[in-house]
Amino acid sequence: MRYALLVSPSTPRVYAQSASALAAAELQVVSADVLGGALTDVQQQSFGSVQYVTFTAPALDELSHSWLSNLAATFALFSLDDAGRLTPLDLRRWDELDSDLVSIQKYAGKTNEAFTKLLFNVTLAASAFAGERRALSVLDPLCGRGTTLNQALMYGHHATGVEVDKKDFEAFSLFIQRWVKDKRLKHEAVQGHVKGHPKLDLALGVTKERYKAGDTLRVTYVSADTHAIAEVFQQRSFDLIVTDAPYGVQHGAHGAETTARKPVDLLASALPIWRAALRPGGAIGIAWNNLVLRREKLAQLLAENGLEVCTSLAHDSFEHRVDASIRRDLIVGRAP
């Protein structure tokens, strides 16, 4: 049977130019890593000047239907008959919270939320937990103002972030507490310190009933250098690590003992710490600027830390232009 995925309108304009190709690559990765290669003959097509990604698949089961509904680019999903007629299918979204959680924040340097969702999905697909619908523990060790944390919460996962920039910590803390209040969600927020580092713990209930029953989503944000993860969290605490590495600017405070300025130095020193925090069967997904760090070098760093690097034509097809100085790509490593 033939299907068609309507690609979501994307902003900024530069990302929109790559959206169909990125959607096709994401679909192929999910097919290979989660669905046993069930999706074939993937093509980018236009119907009436509107971009779609089409593919062939058996009748959709629950797993494939849910994954297709939650691809980063999915705006609508259709079956496609031999006459070219499109029949809409219900979307089975994983979202547990309102979508403005990931879209409402606007600030310079924010990663496009569609790409954040794509990176999250590809990392989840590589893990041993891709077929499970349960709350996972997700870490962003360079979390900025929390785009990845918000995506994790959207999907019903527990989110943990570490960020050295105190202004980002303060901005996220204000945002998330204001957001849950505006949505009238039952929650509890506690601000304190851990190992001398400022920390926010927030637990929220998707519904009042779930909150009363103790069924909450948790977000933890620690204002610290990423290397402090080893002292703040126990080993094997996280199912997924998803992060957007710095694109060539300093991520860290001044001083010999703090994070190195160059992305390659940062990742080389931080990856052993991140790897130790990852549970067996988990996965690490990293987005980075491949104009400042070659893919081969980053793959080598992942492999040296005991991770199986995901390599396929689809996995190697996520590179896209952000601006003149940034060509963003992603890479994923699996933990045995």
Annotate each predicted stretch with a short phrase.
Residues 1-26, 62-63, 71, 80-139, ...:
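Class I S-adenosyl-L-methionine-dependent methyltransferase catalytic core
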Residues 21-88:
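N-terminal accessory interaction module
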